[in-house]
């Protein structure tokens, strides 16, 4: 297996797909990296030469923030929003949707499982 940005990428997959296993690299960035390094996207990881792996690793690690560094930056950005007390920060703090989605119904992913509240009991009829 090739190790890029601290991640073991799967050997039997195409290089363009295997690169997406790295946090911070999607399909577009994988395609860009392969174009810049001159590697055929259809090549399987196991068929890459050591020189190609090194070239790809150098390009990817020196061009973008990936994995732990990127996760830390995202967490720091969210913490900053919460610290300055802006609306987005408050939504993060309360665990509600941040980008204006409705919350009367839906938003279950963000709010978690339902917390049911007992309804008012009906008085027995006479």
From Swiss-Prot:
Residues 95-126 are annotated as: Disordered. Keywords: Ribonucleoprotein, Ribosomal protein, RNA-binding, rRNA-binding, tRNA-binding. GO terms for cellular component: cytosol; small ribosomal subunit. One of its GO terms (molecular function) is tRNA binding. It comes from the Bacteria. One of its GO terms (biological process) is translation. PROSITE patterns: RIBOSOMAL_S13_1, RIBOSOMAL_S13_2. InterPro entries: Rbsml_uS13_C, Ribosomal_uS13, Ribosomal_uS13-like_H2TH, Ribosomal_uS13_bac-type, Ribosomal_uS13_CS. Part of the 30S ribosomal subunit. Forms a loose heterodimer with protein S19. Forms two bridges to the 50S subunit in the 70S ribosome, contacting protein L5 and the 23S rRNA; these bridges are straddled by the 5S rRNA. PANTHER family: 30S RIBOSOMAL PROTEIN S13/40S RIBOSOMAL PROTEIN S18, SMALL RIBOSOMAL SUBUNIT PROTEIN US13M. Located at the top of the head of the 30S subunit, it contacts several helices of the 16S rRNA. In the 70S ribosome structure it contacts the 23S rRNA (bridge B1a) and protein L5 of the 50S subunit (bridge B1b), connecting the top of the two subunits; these bridges are in contact with the A site and P site tRNAs respectively and are implicated in movement during ribosome translocation. Separately contacts the tRNAs in the A and P sites. HAMAP family: Ribosomal_uS13. Belongs to the universal ribosomal protein uS13 family. This is Small ribosomal subunit protein uS13.
């Amino acid at each position: 297996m090739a190790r890029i940005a601290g991640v073991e990428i799967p050997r039997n997959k195409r290089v363009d797909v295997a690169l997406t296993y790295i946090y911070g690299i999607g399909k577009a960035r994988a395609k860009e990296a392969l174009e810049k390094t001159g590697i055929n996207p259809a090549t399987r990881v196991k068929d890459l030469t050591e020189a190609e792996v090194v070239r790809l690793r150098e390009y990817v690690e020196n061009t973008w923030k990936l994995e732990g560094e990127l996760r830390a930056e995202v967490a720091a950005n969210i913490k900053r929003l919460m610290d300055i007390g802006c609306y987005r920060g408050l939504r993060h703090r309360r665990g509600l949707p941040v980008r204006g989605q409705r919350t009367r119904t839906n938003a279950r992913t963000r709010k978690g499982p339902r917390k049911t509240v007992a309804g008012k009991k009906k008085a027995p009829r006479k």
